[in-house]
Amino acid sequence: IGTKTGLIFGGKYEFNLKLSPGPSISRIPLIIPLSWSGLIYMILNYCELVLGGSFYFLPNQNITLLFLPSILMVLLDLVLDPIAVDEKRWSWKRSGAYYGVPFLNFVGWLFTTFLILFVFRLFQSDFNIDKEVDFFFKHSPGILFCLLPAIASRPCFERGLKAPGFIGLLFSLGLVALVVMQNN
């Protein structure tokens, strides 16, 4: 929808298929939705870690488990998208003010993540996860998510993308601080 109509992600944009590994469908590299699916899973696991439960069994947290991961996804996108634009992996017909990324792209990711999580919550099962799983094994995706913005800040600084670099570092520090506060 976004590449053809310009809706959702801040205007018409296109991917540079020469820089995207693997196959594509309708000029959208499959690695993009696969990557974002993995990121959403990592973010959900992180939210489980800081909320002190399982996202499958937090019925009173429905709104939190829709909004918090959506906001975290946008914060991560503030770090990752400037790198991709700088590497010319994708571009918009009308460049945005934030390192070439239009503001509405971030609104689009907030909405898209919220919608994906809403559908997930509608169809989730009551599958019981073994409670005897080791803490680090169970929460390794969430722990990795804590580090991801800091890891992404390095290429930001290497390319002179200072604001996304600092956002990445501060974001990681905040994520780690929340985990420490919630698990002490």
Sequence positions of predicted segments:
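Aromatic-rich, lipid-facing transmembrane alpha helices and their immediate juxtamembrane interface loops
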Residues: 1-184
